[in-house]
Amino acid sequence: MASLEDLIPTVNKLQDVMYDSGIDTLDLPILAVVGSQSSGKSSILETLVGRDFLPRGTGIVTRRPLVLQLNNISPNSPLIEEDDNSVNPHDEVTKISGFEAGTKPLEYRGKERNHADEWGEFLHIPGKRFYDFDDIKREIENETARIAGKDKGISKIPINLKVFSPHVLNLTLVDLPGITKVPIGEQPPDIEKQIKNLILDYIATPNCLILAVSPANVDLVNSESLKLAREVDPQGKRTIGVITKLDLMDSGTNALDILSGKMYPLKLGFVGVVNRSQQDIQLNKTVEESLDKEEDYFRKHPVYRTISTKCGTRYLAKLLNQTLLSHIRDKLPDIKTKLNTLISQTEQELARYGGVGATTNESRASLVLQLMNKFSTNFISSIDGTSSDINTKELCGGARIYYIYNNVFGNSLKSIDPTSNLSVLDVRTAIRNSTGPRPTLFVPELAFDLLVKPQIKLLLEPSQRCVELVYEELMKICHKCGSAELARYPKLKSMLIEVISELLRERLQPTRSYVESLIDIHRAYINTNHPNFLSATEAMDDIMKTRRKRNQELLKSKLSQQENGQTNGINGTSSISSNIDQDSAKNSDYDDDGIDAESKQTKDKFLNYFFGKDKKGQPVFDASDKKRSIAGDGNIEDFRNLQISDFSLGDIDDLENAEPPLTEREELECELIKRLIVSYFDIIREMIEDQVPKAVMCLLVNYCKDSVQNRLVTKLYKETLFEELLVEDQTLAQDRELCVKSLGVYKKAATLISNIL
C-alpha cells in the first residue's frame, strides 16, 4: 500500500485519464471553490500556488471551470534535472523528457525561464511546459475565448492546469465562475441561472468538497456561496467556509463568532484569511511577503490572536490538503467498487457488439452462414412459439396467427347475414325469372340456385382478408427476428428480410387463388342432399309455427285494444263480444301439435304445391285457377276480348314497376326460399371457416417455414456478396470503439487505485 501522500497524485492521474478519454462517469473526489464575484477566490488560489497566474478584470473573468492540480516536487526532483539536461533555454523550441520512461519527448515554446523548478502544463496542449506564469494567464484567457467565445458567456467544459512546484502542497481544486446577480454589459440575461446550474453540477455530487468563500465585509446571511452549499449539503458535512478580507471589516467589528462556528456551524469549520490588496499587486510584492504580512496580522490582532494558528492561507492550504486526503481515502473503496461494476457492464456491452469483424473469405463465409441459420431459426421459432424471447405483455408470432383464425376470421364470417341483401321482391323476381315464359306448378329449384350462389360469394372477402392478415403477421415476424449480432451488419439484415419478404410475396397470390377456388367450388355445385341441409318439410313447419305465433300475438293485441274500448257503450260492447266470439271460434280449432286447421290445410296445400301434387296425386292448381288469377273478379269475356294492340311497351313497364301485393302463396314461397338459403349458407360458412385456415397454413405459413433456410442460402450465400453483406454499421462500430476505449480507461483507473489500496 502506498503512502497517504500518494492519494492526491493518484486522483490527479485518474482525472487526467478521464479527461483524455472524455469520460465523466467516474465521480472522483474534488474540491470546488465557490464564491461571488470579487469575494477573493482568485487571491486565495494564487496565494496557494504562490504565483500570479489567474486573469483579472471586471465582470466575469472565470468563464470556464479551472481544474487546478498542485503537485509538490522536491528541488532535486529528477523531473527538473531531466529537463535541465535536455533544455537549451535560448531555443525557440525545446524538447524535454516525459514523466514516464518510453513516452514521447515533450515540447514547449516560450522565452527563457527564470524559475526552472516551477512550471505549468495544460492538458489541451500535451507536452508543453509554461515556465512563465504570465504565459499561463494568457493561455487561460485564450482557451476560455476559444470555447466560451470572446463575450461574457460561460462554458461547462473545464480547463485542466497542472502546476509543479516545490512551494505547493499536493492539492486539487476546481475554480468555478463567480456568482453574479445582475447581468452587466455583454453578459447574457440569464447569466445568474447559467452560473448557478454550472456550480450545482459540480457541488451536487457527494464526492465533492465545497470551499465556500465569503467576504467579511458582507453579512453572512447574504453569502451566495453558503446558500448554494446548503442546497446540496444541508448538514454542512462537506463544506469548508473561508472568510476573506478580514482586514477590511468596519472598525470595532470582528468575525470571531463566525470563525468559531457559533453563528453558522460547519463540520469542517471556517478559516479566516487576509487577501493581497490591489496595492500589493501593483507594488509587485511577492506572495511570500503577503503571507508573512498575513501571519503578522493575525498574530498581533487583539481578537484573532487567540486563534491565529487556525487562520491564514498557510493553514488553509494544510487544512485543504489533509481534508482532501481524508476525503479521498474514504471514497476510494467506493470508487474502486464502482469501477469494477463499470468494467463488468462495459465487458457485457462489448460482448453484445461482438468482436472485430471477419477479415478473410473463410471467416466471412462462416459468419454469413451462422447469421443466416440464426435468422431462419428465430423466424421458425417465432411462428411455432418456441422462441426464447417470447413477449409476455401481448400476443406475438404464431399466437397472433391463431387469434386471426379463431377470432378475427371466425367473427367476420359469423357477422354475415345471407338474406340481408335479399328482399321479398328479389326472391319473387328470382322465382319468376327462373321459370321464363312457362307457367309453373311448383317452386323451381333453379330459383334457389340463383339466389344462394351470390350469397356464398359473400364469404370470399373475409377469407381473402384472413390471408392478408396472416401474410402481414409473417412480415412482422420477419422484421423482428433479427439478433443483436445481426444488427452490426445492416446490409445483411436488410437482405435477409428482403429474401423472406420476397418468399412471402410469392406465396401470397397462390394462397389467395386457392382460397378463391374454395368459394368457387362451393358455388359450382349446390348440394341440397347434404345431411345438415334443412328439408322443405322442416322449413315449412318452422314457417307455420312462426305464423301461428305471430297470429296469436296479433290476437292478443286486438283483444287488448277491444278491452280498452269498452267505455264506448253497450252497443260497442256487444259488437266487440260478437267479434271476440268469432275470432275465438276461428282460432280455437288447434290440433295436438298446436297447428290450427286452417294453417294445417294451407301448409299441406303448399307442400303439395312445392312438390307438384296433392295427396291424391293430382296437380293442386288447374288451368281455371290460373285463368282466375289473371282475370280476377272481373268479366272474363271482357278479358278475352282485349286485343294485344291495346297494350304498349310503356304499359308493360308500368305493370312491372307497379308490383302487385304478395299473395299468401308468394309469401310462403319467398319465406321458404330464404330459410333454405340460410340453412345452406350456414353449411358452407362452417366449411369455409375450417378450410381457409388449413389452406393458409399449408400454402403460406408451413411452406415458408420449410423453404426459408434453402431460400436464404440460395440467394445470399455467394462469395461475391460476403464483403458487401458484412459492411458494419458505422454508428455501431463507433459505439463499440467507444466501449473498447471506456473499458481501457476503467481498467487503467482500477490499476491506479489498486496500487495505493
Swiss-Prot record:
Subcellular location: Mitochondrion outer membrane
Catalysed transformations (reactions): GTP + H2O = GDP + phosphate + H(+)
Coiled coil location: none
CDD domains, sorted: DLP_1
Region ranges (Disordered): 557-597
SMART domains for this protein: DYNc, GED
Bilayer topology: Peripheral membrane protein
Residue span(s) of domain GED: 670-757
Ranges where the Dynamin-type G domain occurs: 25-333
GO molecular function: GTP binding; GTPase activity; identical protein binding; microtubule binding
Segments of this protein annotated with the region G3 motif: 175-178
Keyword Membrane: yes
Taxonomic superkingdom: Eukaryota
Modified residues (Phosphoserine): 629
Stretch list, region G2 motif: 61-63
InterPro entries attached to this UniProt entry: Dynamin (IPR022812), Dynamin_GTPase (IPR001401), Dynamin_GTPase_CS (IPR019762), Dynamin_N (IPR045063), Dynamin_stalk (IPR000375), G_DYNAMIN_dom (IPR030381), GED (IPR003130), GED_dom (IPR020850)
Region (G4 motif): 244-247
Sequence segments annotated as region (G1 motif): 35-42
Region named G5 motif: 274-277
Family: Belongs to the TRAFAC class dynamin-like GTPase superfamily. Dynamin/Fzo/YdjA family.
Free-text note on domains in this protein's UniProt record: The GTPase domain modulates a rate-limiting step in mitochondrial membrane fission.
Function: Microtubule-associated force-producing protein that participates mitochondrial fission. Fission of mitochondria occurs in many cell types and constitutes an important step in mitochondria morphology, which is balanced between fusion and fission. Functions antagonistically with FZO1.
Record text on subunit structure and interactions: Interacts with FIS1 and MDV1.
Descriptive protein name: Dynamin-related protein DNM1
Source organism (scientific name): Saccharomyces cerevisiae (strain ATCC 204508 / S288c) (Baker's yeast)
Encoding gene, per UniProt annotation: DNM1
